[in-house]
Structure formats: structure tokens, C-alpha cells
Design a protein with these regions (language model features):
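Active-site-proximal loop and beta-strand segments within enzyme catalytic domains
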Residues: 16-21, 40-145, 163, 203-204
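Mobile, glycine-enriched helix-loop/loop "lid" segments at the mouths of ligand-binding/catalytic clefts
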Residues: 188-208
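Catalytic-site signature segments of enzymes, centered on catalytic residues
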Residues: 33-36, 42-45, 105-107, 113-191, ...
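Generic alpha-helical structural context detector
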Residues: 91-95, 128, 175, 234-237, ...
């Protein structure tokens, strides 16, 4: 059992409910194997949601390498009015230890999303509902997942460069790595070429609505990347292959903070799987130093309609795996990724390589 199982695994996970894809780079520098369902002429694209945080972290680290920023810079340089901004570092924003509140549990956010999905909150509204009210804990004295923390990082990158976040991601990451279908979505029109799908989170009565026609990406406060599974595995493979950042920056990016064990203290975007040994977080990276596949890092993303998961397993031949779907219920991108990693571990990457499995550039036959 190895990569030959990918089509069957994806078909089972999607179960005819919508569009889904999976891509695998089985060893560092290899070409990706990619499959998608249902059959179509081109690989589908999706919103990657919080996988965007990995892009933001890489961008901030690149600006640090250029001398425009330092991870030790304090937030007070740009936002002096935020509580304890003089004690919150960019590093703490990146690893969610700065105490910046999130909006995931705020009723008004979900109510406004349902009633006005095409009119997102402004930066000022996100701020007013979260960090303008104070911090969740003293900087450096806890951990809590924070989308507004990454919204602040996005604004910092734009302030120091004078360039929009969309252009920065294109110029500093996507273009150098040849990611031609990866971009920051900023309008409803930007969703037109994505995989079709619906969401019940976009209407007051819970009726499913076409995400591409109604959902404004601005509801993701920190920005949201649209991409394909094959391009996201290329991102991870290139990132950890040293094509984007220096060894020093990568070491900082993968320095992990172990998450609180009490589920009431912290939560990730998807429930922790039993295959997680020690859930941790680096700089824009979810991670586990003692997973069944050794050190594994990456990120999950989820929101209306779309879900995504992409992880890199250093001790498994530096394999990278990404799954994405336009299926709101009953599909777990993370489970697909973990299943693929299990199969790679069981079959052995060296054996898979010797079998010479060819890259499938089209959707599997059904």
C-alpha cells in the first residue's frame, strides 16, 4: 500500500459529496502526485484559509532577513494603543503567545456573516471586537489561537514595505516558487475560478448558499490565499528545502511551543486527532515533534465550504502532503493527510520511489 492507494482514499473521503483533491511529494525535491474528484480537465483550486498563516510567517521572516523587521520588534512601533503593545513581540504574534483575543467565539461575527456575507468587517471592527477590549493573558504567559494577531502582522508587513499584502505574497513567495495559481483573494470576483461549493454559514436560516457568489474573503481578517493542493505541497517542499528562507529562519520557524493540554485553554481549527502526540505551534506552523511520522509541521485551514490541510514530515523522507475540499460537512482534509502519511510510513518512501510511480496530472478515473 502506497501512493497507488491515493485515488481510492480520496474517493472514499469525498464520497460523492463534492470536489476534493490530494497531492503528495513523497521525498524532497520530487514532483507531486496529484488526484482530484470528480473528474475534470484541470486541478481544482480552493480557499486555503488559515494555511495563509504559513505564507504570512514566511513573509515576515523574509523581511527580517532583509533587515526591515526583527522578530523581537514590539507591536508598539505600529499599534501603541493596544494593551501591553510594548511587550508583545512579532514572534509572539506569530506563535500565538501574545494574548491577542480571537473572534471565533463572538456571536456578532457569525450573525453578521450570515446576514451580510458579502460585506465583511473592517480592520477597525475586528479590532474593536477583539484586542481593543484588552488581552486574554499577559504577553508570553499563555497560548491562544488568534486570527487578529495575524491581521496585525499583515498590516505590519504592508506598513514597512509600502506594498499590499496581495502583492507581497505574489512577489516574495508565489512567483519565486513558480506557484502560478496561488494568490490572495480580496473580492468575491476572485472566487469565480475556485471549486464550486455551498455553505450554510452564509444565510440566517442555514440554507446553503453558493460561496463563490456570496462570500467576501475579507471575513478572513488576516487575508486568505487561494491555491491548489499541488501548489501547497510545492510550497512546503520548497520552504523546507531551503529555497525561500535561510537555515536560521527555518530553525526559528520550526521552534515549537507545546500547546496547553486543557482543551478549555486552547483549541486548533480542527479537533486534535489521536495521531497527534504533542500538539505544538511554531511560527505560522502547527507541529508535532513526536507524531507517528516523527517531526511533522504544516497547517490546517477551514471556513465556509472549503477545508484544507498541508503537512511536511521531516522523518518520512521529507514528504509533503496536502488535501483540500469544497465539502462543508463530512470531509476532513486533515484526516486525508494523516491517512496518506500512514500509508507512506507503512510502505516506506524508498520502496515507493523504487516502484517508479508516475505523477498523475489528471483526475483519477471513476
Amino acid at each position: 500500500m502506497g501512493l497507488t492507494q491515493l485515488p481510492e482514499m480520496l474517493l472514499a473521503a469525498a464520497n460523492g459529496r463534492g470536489v476534493a483533491s490530494v497531492a503528495v511529494i513523497e521525498r524532497a525535491g520530487a514532483e507531486p502526485h496529484v488526484y482530484w474528484v470528480p473528474a475534470s480537465d484541470s486541478e481544482p483550486a480552493f480557499l486555503a484559509y488559515s494555511i495563509t498563516k504559513t505564507f504570512t510567517a514566511a513573509l515576515i521572516l523574509k523581511l527580517c532577513e532583509e533587515g526591515q523587521l526583527s522578530l523581537d520588534y514590539r507591536l508598539a512601533r505600529w499599534f501603541p494603543h493596544i494593551t501591553h503593545a510594548d511587550r508583545i513581540s512579532l514572534r509572539q504574534l506569530l506563535n500565538h503567545t501574545g494574548g491577542i483575543p480571537d473572534y471565533g467565539g463572538i456571536r456578532a461575527y457569525h450573525e453578521d456573516l450570515k446576514s451580510s456575507p458579502s460585506i465583511p468587517w473592517s480592520f477597525e471592527r475586528f479590532a474593536a471586537e477583539t484586542f481593543d477590549k484588552g488581552l486574554w493573558f499577559e504577553p508570553g504567559q499563555g497560548w491562544a489561537y488568534s486570527n487578529p494577531g495575524y491581521m496585525l502582522l499583515k498590516r505590519v508587513a504592508e506598513e514597512v514595505t509600502g506594498v499590499s499584502y496581495r502583492a507581497l505574497i505574489s512577489e516574495r513567495i508565489a512567483r519565486p516558487l513558480g506557484l502560478r495559481r496561488t494568490f490572495v483573494a480580496e473580492s468575491i470576483k476572485d472566487l469565480a475560478e475556485l471549486a464550486p461549493g455551498t455553505s450554510s454559514a452564509l444565510s440566517p436560516d442555514g440554507a446553503p448558499r453558493d460561496v463563490r457568489a456570496h462570500y467576501h474573503p475579507g471575513w478572513v481578517s488576516h487575508g486568505v490565499v487561494a491555491s491548489t493542493a499541488s501548489e501547497l505541497v510545492r510550497l512546503l517542499d520548497s520552504l523546507f528545502g531551503g529555497e525561500l528562507l535561510s537555515p536560521h529562519s527555518l530553525a526559528q520557524m520550526t521552534e515549537l511551543v507545546v500547546l496547553p493540554t486543557d482543551p478549555s485553554e486552547a483549541s486548533l481549527e480542527q479537533d486534535a486527532s489521536s495521531r497527534r502526540g504533542k500538539p505544538s505551534y511554531g511560527l505560522g506552523l502547527m507541529g508535532d515533534p513526536v507524531s507517528p511520522w516523527g517531526l511533522a509541521v504544516g497547517h490546517n485551514g477551514g471556513g465556509p465550504c472549503y477545508s484544507a490541510s498541508a503537512f511536511h514530515a521531516f522523518d518520512l523522507g521529507s514528504a509533503s502532503v496536502c488535501a483540500m475540499g469544497a465539502i462543508e460537512e463530512g470531509f476532513s482534509a486533515e484526516d486525508v493527510v494523516f491517512d496518506v502519511l500512514d500509508h507512506l510510513a507503512a510502505s516506506g518512501n524508498s520502496r515507493a520511489a523504487q516502484q517508479g510511480i508516475a505523477t498523475d496530472g489528471a483526475s483519477p478515473r471513476s
